[in-house]
């Protein structure tokens, strides 16, 4: 192999390598962005209200240790046929109503979002099994960037706030 040919071959290989690295950097940056929301958030003091059937609420505190705000857009759990993010809002004539929360649960940078009875919470609907006190429930949060955060929540007996979860209507 002549020196001229080897130099040209080396130059072509270097150019191909740069193009490949450039393409993979974009993919890596996208993957890092997708991992960002879930990796910045922790769930604390999480629990689920015990229920024999139907539906129930999940509560706790979502903490964002990141430098950017994130938004939880959905949740899932193998114990429920359907899971929704809910809010409780006051009505003009008094009382309050529970409804799906448009836009999800925003968590500011360095802040928290509390899920509590009578306020924002996660609804586990169409329960597939009784949720008994002391058991754990698997839940996965999904964020607007596509990342996910799995966690478990303990089932507890709770009669405070006198909440009764029933379908509307």
Q: How would you describe each model-predicted region?
A:
Residues 1-21:
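Sec-dependent bacterial lipoprotein signal peptides
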């Amino acid at each position: 192999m002549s020196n001229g040919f080897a130099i040209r071959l080396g130059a072509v290989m270097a150019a191909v390598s740069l193009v490949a690295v450039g393409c993979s950097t974009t993919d890596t940056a996208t993957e890092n962005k997708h991992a960002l929301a879930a990796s910045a958030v922790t769930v604390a003091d999480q629990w689920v209200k015990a229920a024999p059937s139907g539906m129930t609420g999940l509560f706790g505190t979502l903490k964002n240790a990141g430098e950017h705000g994130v938004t939880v857009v959905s949740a899932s759990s193998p114990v429920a046929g359907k899971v929704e993010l809910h809010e409780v809002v006051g009505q003009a004539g008094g009382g309050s109503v529970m409804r799906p929360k448009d836009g999800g649960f925003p968590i500011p940078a360095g802040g928290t979002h509390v899920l509590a009875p009578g306020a924002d919470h996660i609804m586990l609907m169409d329960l597939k099994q009784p949720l008994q006190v002391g058991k754990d429930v698997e839940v996965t949060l999904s964020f607007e960037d596509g990342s996910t955060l799995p966690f478990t929540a303990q089932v507890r007996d709770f009669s405070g706030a006198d909440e009764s979860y029933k379908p509307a209507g």
